[in-house]
């Protein structure tokens, strides 16, 4: 099985309808529990669906994340209040974009730290770029924590 390209860029209600569900047209995100080898975990989706994989510990969660990331070193995300867990995941996955407590788009400057940018992330390029240099800059983003005001 694989993720259907027909659903790339479609809104959540289109995906829900295809799954036999009826949701409000303004639904922004679908989520469901699945196993670690499901295509929604293994493949890039580019659609509003969040697969949830149940694990017994943060260590197992990091291990499963590492497997799903396939050593592309592109993007990883964690939601946690424990900075040590965030640090352990950052070190294990070593991705160009690492977002803590926010959506993946925060790593590109949408709702997170830094300027709006595009990612030419590994393995296809050099990560977050800017118009002046178009070279790789590593960004580490944390949302809603460590505020100084």
Regions found by a protein language model. Name each.
Residues 1-13, 42-47:
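Flexible, acidic loop-helix segments that line cofactor/substrate-binding pockets
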Residues 20-149:
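Conserved C-terminal structural/oligomerization subdomain of aldehyde/semialdehyde dehydrogenase
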Residues 1, 11-18, 34-37:
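Glycine-rich, charged/polar anion/phosphate-binding loops
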